[in-house]
Regions:
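Residues forming the flavin
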Residues: 1-340
């Protein structure tokens, strides 16, 4: 997890004006972590969690193990796969991968085409505009019908008006940069001989073709549940998000004793909700370990409340944004082989 703050201590000074205040705010958390005295092993890859919570990982090309009494998983989210014809061609990657290039290396693809839907697509487009390298086009899959259906969440969205204001600001940045936008696109495909050379799609009844060498795909995010599943934690289907989420109580404790989950790995809610969820889990772990009484734990936990208003791990405003921008992931009615 933690992709929103990736490399924040190093990149904030040089690229903070491009990545925005939500990104640079991560220095507050990394600063608190350094002052806490907690041992922080960065750049590690965990590849096994065995009996008695023996964790095997690799760091700086060396293997190591550590044992724990309790485990807190904060694995974050994964981008939902968007398999379209040509998606395996060199030059095609997820929008999140494009953002990682910007955060870690300051690299912005020239003339890239953004394809899909979701708030992250607008964020990356706005960041590319600020970097002086706007996308060649945005090809969006959400329809007018999706926007209309999202109106039922407008009350919750207004309660979270600062988020709406941020979204409107991003849209204004993209519009001022005159980035071509095509909403309600269908039959999207990437063309090319050995690499991406163009994106073709249907828009308002006509076929269009935009030449490009880089394509960023995005169709929302889902919880990264690989570690949770490997531990045997129960999961259930979240119909609103069209994804499996782990079975957790209000504090983030799973049905496997002494395993807790916080952040988007527990259900998509964004960075701020993840931060609050992490605090709740930390309090519960401290209580279970005998360092806090139940009364003190409950007092420190409120507010925020253990769960959001929707009961799904998402805030009212995120419900509105996800519904409007992503629509509902529609099940395929007929299977057919596609040229990939």
């Amino acid at each position: 997890g933690g992709q929103i703050y990736r490399d924040v201590d190093r990149a904030a000074a040089s690229r903070g004006h491009i990545l925005g205040a939500d990104y640079t705010d991560g220095r507050r958390l990394t600063g608190d972590l350094r002052q806490s005295g907690v041992e922080h092993i960065s750049g590690a890859v965990v590849w096994a969690i065995e009996d008695e919570f023996r964790i095997s990982y690799t760091c700086e090309e060396r293997g190591a193990q550590i044992e724990a009494d309790r485990i807190l998983l904060a694995t974050g989210a994964l981008e939902r796969p968007m398999p379209i014809p040509g998606w395996t061609l060199p030059g095609v990657m997820t929008a999140g991968a494009g953002q990682i290039l910007l955060k870690q290396s300051g690299i912005v693809a020239q003339g890239a085409v953004l394809v899909g839907s979701g708030p992250l697509l607008y964020l990356i487009a706005a960041q590319m505009v600020r970097a002086g390298t706007p996308p060649a086009a945005m090809i969006e899959t959400q329809t007018l019908g999706d926007m209309i259906r999202a109106l039922r969440h407008v009350g919750g969205a207004l309660r979270g008006w600062p988020y709406m204001a941020k979204g409107l600001k991003m849209l204004a940045e993209i519009k001022r940069a005159k980035v071509p936008s095509f909403t309600g696109a269908t039959q999207i495909a990437v063309e090319g001989e050995g690499k991406a050379e163009a994106v073709t799609f249907t828009h308002k009844g006509g076929r269009r073709r935009i030449a490009c060498e880089t394509v960023f795909l995005h169709h929302g995010v889902v919880p990264n549940t690989q570690a949770a599943r490997s531990l045997g934690i129960g999961h259930h289907w979240d119909a609103a998000q069209s994804a499996f989420v782990p079975e957790l109580d209000a504090w983030g404790q799973s049905d496997v004793a002494e395993v807790f989950i916080a952040g988007d790995g527990a259900g998509i809610g964004g960075a701020k909700l993840a931060e609050h969820a992490g605090r709740l889990v930390a309090l519960k772990i401290a209580q279970n370990a005998g360092h806090l009484s139940t009364q003190v734990c409950n007092r420190l936990a409120a507010p925020p409340t253990p769960r959001s208003d929707t009961g799904t791990g998402r805030t009212p405003v995120s419900e509105c944004c996800l519904s409007a921008l992503c629509g509902r992931v529609k099940p395929c009615k007929q299977h057919r082989d596609l040229p990939l």
